[in-house]
């Protein structure tokens, strides 16, 4: 342990009440001899959080923070990301990545309120979350001390963690099969599972891994129709009923999950260099992404839409890698938000056996002109003869290139 960390007096621990952070809590007390403040964020993970309070109290914690951050999470983090249609490596909707900036922000704020001189997270030394948390800490308080137990202790596996917990009589949660659980991350946007039988990417994930969606094959035989209303790029209503951001995403999760939507078995490239396999469920987010892209399809100019599509992978990578608080992410966000000024209207979708299909879209700011696109008489809205000059000018460079090539062949 370095001298810079020996003098820690009080630390704010991002605490879920699960195996890892409960072991970390006890380890901090034993190793650092410091006061521990626990912070548990309700991001819509769908589990009772009072057990986390009771476990922290059992371990002697005096200052316990449990906060409902669901509305802030969706309003200030999920929705801005969805304005960008952000998807990492073509498929991942960034459910874990987008939660870390908010948790880091509140840890730093609580540290300031309580006079803590350090923060601590439970991320492993192999994963992305250690980077995401610590980049957030650095951006929000570069002077704060950071404790990353997985990079310090000799508990190098989940088996050793369980042994430590049993030795110190720390209760261990079991899954519905009576086993120690997968490594799970959950919030209102998604739930993910890693580890155990999922570590071999050649093996199909067993059905018991899934918890937020039915098997597409078992979904209702009758499709569900839903209309999502948008204002300036953000979803604001379902079937005409205005809802808060968190309430709306909760409802989309229910509708999507009931129809088997949002399942993903993914091998991704971690920022730290290795590949990892995880199983994700993002039912509401999947529906929301399809709806938002459909809303943009009639309200965004072609040039703006194509530029957004070009920038999206970079934006998604910034979030995945933990650079939410970076100036480049904020610059891109300003551009994206500007593009959303007219993204207002409604999208109708059919949810059926794992698919969310757009069946209608409308907007008071639509750029779709039936008068121009019709196959019937357009009453002079578009002169098809104009296309000849348009094509001739666009073909000029190709004709010049062909002429040069023909000359050089002789």
Swiss-Prot record:
GO CC entries: cytoplasm
The enzyme's E.C. designation: 6.3.4.5
Top-level class of the enzyme under EC nomenclature: ligase
Binding-site residues, L-aspartate: 124, 128-129
Protein's pathway: Amino-acid biosynthesis; L-arginine biosynthesis; L-arginine from L-ornithine and carbamoyl phosphate: step 2/3
Binding-site residues for L-citrulline, renumbered to this chain: 92, 97, 128, 132, 183, 192, 268, 280
Entry keyword set: Amino-acid biosynthesis, Arginine biosynthesis, ATP-binding, Cytoplasm, Ligase, Nucleotide-binding
Main location: cytoplasm
GO annotation (BP), single: L-arginine biosynthetic process
Pfam families in UniProt: Arginosuc_syn_C (PF20979), Arginosuc_synth (PF00764)
Residues the entry annotates as binding ATP: 14-22, 41, 122
Keyword Protease: no
GO molecular function: argininosuccinate synthase activity; ATP binding
Subcellular location: Cytoplasm
Oligomer and partners: Homotetramer.
Family: Belongs to the argininosuccinate synthase family. Type 1 subfamily.
The protein, known as: Argininosuccinate synthase
Organism: Parvibaculum lavamentivorans (strain DS-1 / DSM 13023 / NCIMB 13966)
């Amino acid at each position: 342990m370095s001298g810079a960390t020996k003098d820690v007096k009080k630390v704010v621990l991002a605490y879920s009440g699960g195996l890892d952070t409960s072991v970390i809590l006890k380890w901090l007390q034993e190793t650092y001899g410091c006061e521990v403040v626990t912070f548990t964020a309700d991001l819509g993970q769908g589990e009772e959080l009072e057990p986390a309070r009771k476990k922290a109290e059992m371990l002697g914690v005096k200052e316990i923070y449990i906060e409902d951050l669901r509305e802030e999470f969706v309003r200030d983090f999920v929705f801005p990301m969805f304005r960008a249609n952000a998807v990492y490596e073509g498929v991942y909707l960034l459910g874990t990545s987008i939660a870390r900036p908010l948790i880091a922000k509140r840890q730093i704020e609580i540290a300031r309120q309580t006079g803590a001189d350090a923060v601590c997270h439970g991320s492993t030394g192999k994963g992305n979350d250690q980077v995401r948390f610590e980049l957030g800490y650095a951006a929000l308080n570069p002077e704060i001390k950071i404790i990353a137990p997985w990079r310090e202790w000799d508990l190098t596996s989940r088996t050793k963690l369980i042994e430590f917990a049993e030795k110190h009589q720390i209760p261990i949660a079991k899954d519905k099969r009576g086993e120690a659980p997968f490594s799970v991350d959950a919030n209102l946007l998604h739930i993910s599972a890693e580890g155990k039988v999922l570590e071999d990417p050649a093996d199909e994930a067993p059905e018991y891994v899934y918890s937020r969606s039915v098997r597409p094959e078992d979904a209702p035989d009758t499709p569900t129709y839903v209309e999502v209303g948008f204002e300036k790029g953000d979803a604001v209503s379902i079937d005409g009923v205005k809802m808060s951001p968190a309430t709306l995403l909760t409802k989309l999760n229910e509708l999507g999950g009931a129809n088997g939507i949002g399942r993903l078995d993914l091998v991704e490239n971690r920022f730290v260099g290795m590949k990892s396999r995880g199983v994700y469920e993002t039912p509401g987010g999947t529906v929301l992404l399809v709806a938002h892209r459909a809303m943009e399809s009639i309200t965004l100019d072609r040039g703006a839409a194509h530029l957004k599509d070009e920038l999206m992978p970079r934006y998604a990578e910034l979030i995945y890698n933990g650079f939410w608080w970076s100036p480049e992410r904020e610059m891109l966000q300003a551009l994206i938000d500007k593009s959303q000024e007219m993204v207002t209207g409604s999208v109708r979708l059919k949810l059926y056996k794992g698919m969310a299909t757009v069946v209608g879209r409308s907007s008071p700011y639509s750029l779709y002109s039936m008068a121009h696109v019709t196959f019937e008489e357009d009453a002079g809205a578009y002169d098809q003869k104009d296309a000849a000059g348009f094509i001739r000018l666009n073909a000029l460079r190709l004709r010049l290139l062909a002429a040069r090539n023909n000359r050089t062949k002789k």
